[in-house]
């Protein structure tokens, strides 16, 4: 059994280079006044690739060696984000010999670069969408799977392994138009209809008890949702996996998978892993590299998050209860208070990747729009991320293969921190024949998107323009992205 330490949260941050390699168009920016690191350098890192806020607010952690020799096991999990780590953990807990392969570092992609908000639902499918599309029993089962069960599972893992994820409870959806309160009310009613009642609608004045901003017309207070340190969660899942005898290889990119008569052969740069029973593709927007082009159901897009320097005013003067918030704009703002009087703030979704300067200007403008009382605003961290979306808004969950099952999940639309963990457990349970939860997810139909990746830089701006025109014509209609 590999002995590794639990992830440890710091009281604030340590400015340092990232231990993850810079991949593709993703980037991290650090305020230049902090970009003076100790003379002690970390192999494979650079001051041009600083750690983002999440990595900086955790103590240095274990790194795993890359795979150098052929090996075999029962199940290979490809991807060390939340989905892959949860799947691996729950397989190992049930005695399944599992190896996890990560092309970079654990939590280096979307799982360690998101907004850290815990909200119910399956990507852009919320309770009303489920109630409209499915039978009552199926909708109820799916809603609880993606809400109460997903949130409880995170708490159960935290308690079982004695892990601190900086978990906090309560969430707010803030309406930017009075008409959006109708949609929020219908959503809350659908949740009650499906047997879950943790929400209440508030008007403009009561909402100001929670958000000290005149920008909103009301909102939905959700006591089920909340916030978390996503990289601490990701590392905690890996800690549990290793405690149960699991094996992790980092900097081990999978080039191809091939099913043969005696197993599935997973080809990496330096070695082959033979999965005797199953393979799990937990690589989200990169799934296309290992799936056929004919089965492309997602379009990738880029997201952006920043963390301020410690503010001059107390964050409780902005968010008295400390609840995370996202709003009902088409291009949502999302934000929450974090350690040392900082505000973490994210927004936008683009088909081409913005650079640091454009992102910095945009997010500073959005913060001043929502909270004009903030003076002398300064950013310490800004970074980009990559995710993907499906046409119908739900996550694409697949199980295929001939003799040996291959699982794949992608299309998160920028939502789903808690749900990735729950779906990881569903994959493990499906593999051992313990439940049909994954079968429920795989029954959701998805539309193929021909040349989706190639057309993303054109399709996403076009869609945003069309929805923008629609919002001007009918500002009370709520469509968020």
Give the location of each predicted region.
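Extreme N-terminal leader/targeting segments of oxidoreductases
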Residues: 1-75
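C-terminal catalytic lobe of FAD-dependent flavoproteins
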Residues: 3-6, 354-355, 360-472
């Amino acid at each position: 059994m590999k002995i590794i330490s639990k992830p440890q949260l710091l009281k604030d941050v340590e400015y340092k280079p990232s231990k993850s390699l810079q991949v593709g168009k993703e980037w991290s920016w650090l305020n230049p006044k902090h970009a003076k690191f100790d003379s002690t350098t970390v192999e494979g890192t650079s001051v041009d690739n600083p750690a983002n806020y999440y990595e900086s607010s955790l103590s240095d952690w274990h790194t795993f060696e890359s795979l150098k020799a052929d090996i075999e096991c029962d199940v290979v999990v490809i991807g060390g984000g939340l989905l892959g780590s949860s799947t691996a953990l729950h397989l190992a807990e049930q005695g399944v010999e599992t190896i996890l392969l990560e092309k970079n570092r654990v939590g280096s992609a979307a799982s360690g670069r998101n907004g850290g908000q815990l909200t119910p639902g399956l990507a852009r499918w919320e309770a009303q969408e489920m109630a409209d599309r499915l039978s009552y029993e199926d909708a109820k089962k799916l809603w609880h799977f993606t809400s109460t069960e997903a949130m409880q599972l995170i708490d159960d893992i935290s308690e079982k392994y004695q892990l601190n994820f900086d978990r906090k409870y309560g969430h707010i959806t803030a309406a930017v138009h009075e008409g959006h309160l109708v949609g929020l009310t219908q959503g809350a009613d659908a949740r009650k209809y499906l047997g879950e009642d943790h929400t209440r609608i508030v008007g403009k004045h009561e909402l100001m008890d929670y958000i000290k901003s005149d920008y909103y017309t009301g909102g939905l207070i959700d006591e089920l949702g909340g916030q978390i340190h996503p990289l601490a969660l990701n590392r905690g899942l890996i800690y549990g996996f290793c405690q149960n005898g699991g094996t992790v290889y980092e900097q081990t990119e999978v080039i191809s998978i091939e099913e043969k008569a005696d197993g599935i052969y997973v080809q990496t740069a330096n070695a082959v892993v033979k999965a005797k029973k199953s393979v799990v593709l937990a690589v989200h927007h990169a799934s296309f590299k290992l799936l056929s082009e004919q089965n492309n159901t997602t379009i990738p897009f880029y997201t952006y998050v920043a963390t301020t320097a410690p503010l001059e005013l107390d964050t409780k003067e902005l968010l008295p209860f400390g609840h995370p918030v996202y709003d009902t704009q088409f291009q949502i703002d999302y934000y929450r208070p974090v350690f040392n009087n900082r505000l973490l703030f994210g927004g936008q979704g683009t088909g081409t990747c913005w650079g640091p300067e454009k992102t910095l200007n945009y997010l500073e403008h959005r913060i001043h729009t929502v909270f004009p009382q903030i003076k002398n605003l300064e950013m310490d961290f800004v970074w980009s991320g990559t995710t993907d979306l499906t046409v119908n808004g739900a996550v694409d969950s697949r199980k295929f293969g001939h003799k040996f099952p291959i699982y794949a999940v992608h299309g998160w639309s920028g939502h789903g921190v808690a749900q990735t963990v729950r779906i990881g457990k569903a994959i493990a349970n499906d593999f051992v024949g313990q439940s049909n939860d994954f079968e429920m997810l795989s029954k959701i139909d998805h539309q193929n998107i021909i040349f989706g990746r190639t057309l993303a830089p054109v399709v996403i701006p076009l869609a945003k323009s069309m929805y923008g025109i629609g919002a001007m014509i009918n500002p009370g209609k709520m469509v968020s992205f």
